[in-house]
Amino acid sequence: MNSNIEDDPWSSGWNDDNDNNNNNNTSINDPLTGATATTTPYQSSYLTSSQLFTSTGGGGSGSGGGYNSGVNTYNTTIPPNLINVPSSYETIYSHFITKYNNNNNNNNSNSTFTLNDFEINIIDKLISLNYLTNYQKQKILDIIYENNLLPINQSFKFYQILGLLALEIDVPGTGDYVTLQFRLNNNLPDLPEKFINEIINEENEQEEQTSGLLGNRNRSIQSHSHFGPNNQDDWNIDDSTTISGGGGGGGGNFGDPLLVDHSYIHDDLIDESRSVGGTQPQQGGGGGSGGGSGSGSGTIAPNVDSSYIEKYINDIKDQFKPLFSGIDLIKIKEVPEKEGIIFKHINYMITHDLKIGGTSSGTKKVIRRYSDFVWLMEYLLEKYPFRVIPGLPPKKFTGASPDSQFLQRRRRGLHRFLNQLIKHPILSQEPIVQSFLTVPTDLTTWKKQAKIDSSLEFKGQKIQTDFINVIWPIMGEPFLKKWRQAEENIQFIIDKWVKIIILVERYERRQQQISFDNGKFAEMLNGFSKLNTKIYPDNEDNNNSTRNDVNVNVVVVDNNENYKQDFDFNSSGDIININQCLNSIGEFFNKSSQVLIDESYIINTKTLEKFKNYLDYLNSLQELFERTKQLSINQIDLLDKRIKDQEIKFKKISEENPDIKGGELIKLRQSIINDKQEIFQQLNKDWLIKQCCLQEFIIFQETQFLITELWVEWCKDRLKCQEKLVGLYDNLNQEIIHDMPLER
């Protein structure tokens, strides 16, 4: 009745079984490739978290990887082709891609040319030739990640990165993204000729010493994951086909950094003895383990049994109760008066009896605007990007019909948003959420004097050793596989559920139409019974007509009394009995019409909302997948490679001539220490993200019972309706069988 979803799925071949081959299905956007996703004709018009975030300009980044709306990390625009590419760029690109393809052909591999290879073979070479400094290198790498200049093997992005390097070499400080775009296709500087010659004349031994162009990071990964037959390293397996790390491998990560397990790096940093003084990680340092005695993902504590893991899972699930159970925790209604001098807006009254935020028991009422809901969602996205956050209904529906219908749909969407928030075990404890539901004053005024901390939820936290050493070794592999499987299929599941909602709405509209038709039945039968005696005259009608005509009556009575008695057409009064039964049938249609109206109301206000509530959870999970791909990007592999290369260099210089190059050794040692501190911070964040996503995935499993709840109630409500209709049919049947004549 009030659907915001496309009405006719049949026109698009909606019942095809081959959903995976259907071009109408939406593919998951990949922020690393910049691929433009196709859209499905069944997209919900509800505002999802990523849509809201990308449409707003607010929200600074939290520590450790929060949202930063000013950074273009999810650019899916297909860029135009570069023209006037400097010849040096083409030389470099041709040189590396040719060697890359030849190496793939020789080794029968299908590995990917990564940014790590670019850094080793180009950026580090420029540093060794004193064209760039390490600070400038880090600045360029940050620009690459922030502006999505990946994957590196695309010529357009390869040339842009070379342009950044050339600009920085030409005039230090100008190697930024804005300057690059301004000078794109117009007068980009050439790379130094000396550098070009060095690259072209590079010897094979030097290429091997720096891990080579095709130095695949997963060679090291495979050596730690024991993946493959006979525990042999497979040098040709890349990230696109393998998830490796603690507990074994799983499917490809298709651009999702969450699916890369860095447990092997944690093992290296903890277990290997570093010869560079003072770089051994400390107990509980800001790194991935939180301690130096853990066994890592490769070893499972011998005393861990399945009951411990089951308790861990059940404890998380017990915190989340998504079922309605006939209770609305929070109610919301529109305040009749529209406020605003020029631009009118709707206020919403939120009512609840929740005891939250240290408030006393009793009913609480607060007034909020739609913009207040938007602010709350922006805050949650910034602080809890790795949580399942429900979406908001849009400010305005596309093609919204009557204003009252639009407002009703938006109010219901806000109602679902608040009830899903308050049922979430983490979000419900957020002070801002509690203040939103309890502060009686205007929220804009309250925000001016309130202290609001929007930094990432696990800022300053360290991952627990129990998670790394006990939970992850057992749950890591199956979780990554199930996460990937869910991420691949979530859009198809959403499409199916949207079509189910369409059918429910059609069923409701049909019940309304049947109710309308039943009313027409009663009206037409009543009119028919009043007129049918004109063609089926009975004895009573004949007597009435003779009394009204005195002259005729006199003649008839005096001269033709016997003939009059013989001339009656329907002396038995059958038409009267028939009309009385027709009136009973009309009453049946009126009563059944009311039953169908009641059923339609229940579907529209209760059943359909539960179907859409479950759809909201599906959309929220899909949004979590997309945010995780965007925000869990890290440089762990790059840092690990750089540390190992620097340690090799440190050892080599120490053995050759430590006295002469003492200053260089000090700088190198400090660089190693800095990189280790950075990698431990990034490992810690990576572990915390994985822990958070694992918890959310476990919590989401409880939503499966929403499917049971809504279909059980669907059946109960339909049964009640049918029982009422059957009772009406039975009474009508008994009446007309005995009272409606079939013959004289």
From Swiss-Prot:
Coiled-coil intervals, chain numbering: none
CDD domains according to UniProt: BAR_SNX8 (cd07597), PX_SNX8_Mvp1p_like (cd06866)
Pfam family, one: Snx8_BAR_dom
GO MF assignments: phosphatidylinositol-3-phosphate binding
Domain notes from UniProt: The PX domain binds phosphatidylinositol 3-phosphate which is necessary for peripheral membrane localization.
Job of this protein: Required for vacuolar protein sorting.
Name by which UniProt lists this protein: Sorting nexin MVP1
Organism: Candida albicans (strain SC5314 / ATCC MYA-2876)
Lineage: Eukaryota, Fungi, Dikarya, Ascomycota, Saccharomycotina
